[in-house]
């Protein structure tokens, strides 16, 4: 699974201050560190960037590309800022990617022409006019709308990254939303027949938002394995999470097989396996809604 480094984010105090002060050093140091950590893309997250977003994105893109060749995700709702970044982006190892275009007319009409103009990739986000889709079927409907727009604007499948939207396991809707993301991925191969070459991505760490910090890694790792089983090609992640990096590169196959067995409905007694394996069994059951989430799920 490809990794998109999420760390260059305006919400990180040090980075936000550096952006505000136009101080290149912290930004370049972080970009170099992400590249050394082996990420396949670096996400530049400016947030809303309503005031001066165009000038800021142009400066950050130039600043980052002075020191690394890693392709960039341009992450903001400000279309003007995205275009400003694309104007100065230098294609070294791949196209820049617009993160993201929602399945809403105002987003599609504004950003698809920009993507086509600059030969940029797009994250096609399954967020529709009514907000978050309720289930896998609604995700499929929104995906079809976004794919149609890609075809209209000549965006090749290889430049399209479908994001089904990962939601927190701690949310009230988790028993529907967390499994429905998996269900959507089961139909993804059929969608790829409509737009060959299209791949998928997600904000993986969203699944553990709201969980105690020490429990977030196992949620992220387990959900990564579950999504990857059905073709999830990439994820926006912490570039410096070494354990997650191992899972993304296919490490720990014995845990992967165990997770798949639980997904397939096998009842595995946690007492019959090691403590580590039992934790992954329990976590998988929570993520497929066979057990309720609580902060003490590993202790039950």
Task: List PLM regions with ranges.
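Glycine-rich, proline-tolerant flexible connector loops at the mouths of alpha/beta enzymes
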Residues: 35-73, 166-174, 178
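Active-site mouth loops of central-metabolism enzymes
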Residues: 3-29, 53, 99-105, 131-136, ...
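Catalytic beta/alpha-barrel core
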Residues: 43-49, 70-78, 95-105, 126
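Acidic (Asp/Glu)-rich catalytic clusters
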Residues: 35-36, 65-66, 86-93, 109-121, ...
